[in-house]
Amino acid sequence: MIIGVGTDLVEIARIAQSIERLGERFIDRILTAAEKERWSEISNLEKANSFVAKRFAAKEAAVKALGTGIGLGVSFQHFNVSNLPSGQPVLTVDESIIARYDFPVSWHLSLTDEKAYAQAFVILESK
């Protein structure tokens, strides 16, 4: 059964401006340690900005599916986005968020980017 659905669309240039203006403070707020490690390995600036924008969108979509938004005990750090060898994105959610449910849940994530925008779609469902 679907518990929640979330989507987010972000302008990549807006994320790039935040990175330029706030630097590591912004990166540390948005990316987990594992994501930050992957981001630091990207040498192309456009790809690096897209990487951050997609993760930002994914986490915003996740909190919309959760129904909480960022704040009130939920932060960007509670969500990690990685990829399977096939390229499929995977959303890993902190146990403190999962513990809110008395039943097992699954998170499904779809990401896309096209020129100026990054978009994420998240479905939260009971198993």
UniProtKB/Swiss-Prot annotation:
It catalyses: apo-[ACP] + CoA = holo-[ACP] + adenosine 3',5'-bisphosphate + H(+). Belongs to the P-Pant transferase superfamily. AcpS family. One of its GO terms (molecular function) is holo-[acyl-carrier-protein] synthase activity. It holds the Pfam family ACPS. The keyword Metal-binding applies. Transfers the 4'-phosphopantetheine moiety from coenzyme A to a Ser of acyl-carrier-protein. GO terms for biological process: fatty acid biosynthetic process. Keywords: Cytoplasm, Fatty acid biosynthesis, Fatty acid metabolism, Lipid biosynthesis, Lipid metabolism, Magnesium, Metal-binding, Transferase. Its EC number is 2.7.8.7. The lineage of its organism: Bacteria, Pseudomonadati, Pseudomonadota, Gammaproteobacteria, Oceanospirillales. It is found in: Cytoplasm. HAMAP family: AcpS. InterPro entries: 4-PPantetheinyl_Trfase_dom (IPR008278), 4-PPantetheinyl_Trfase_dom_sf (IPR037143), ACPS (IPR002582), Ppantetheine-prot_Trfase_dom (IPR004568). Its main location: cytoplasm. GO terms for cellular component: cytoplasm. Mg(2+) binds at residues 8, 60. This is Holo-[acyl-carrier-protein] synthase. Its cofactor is Mg(2+).
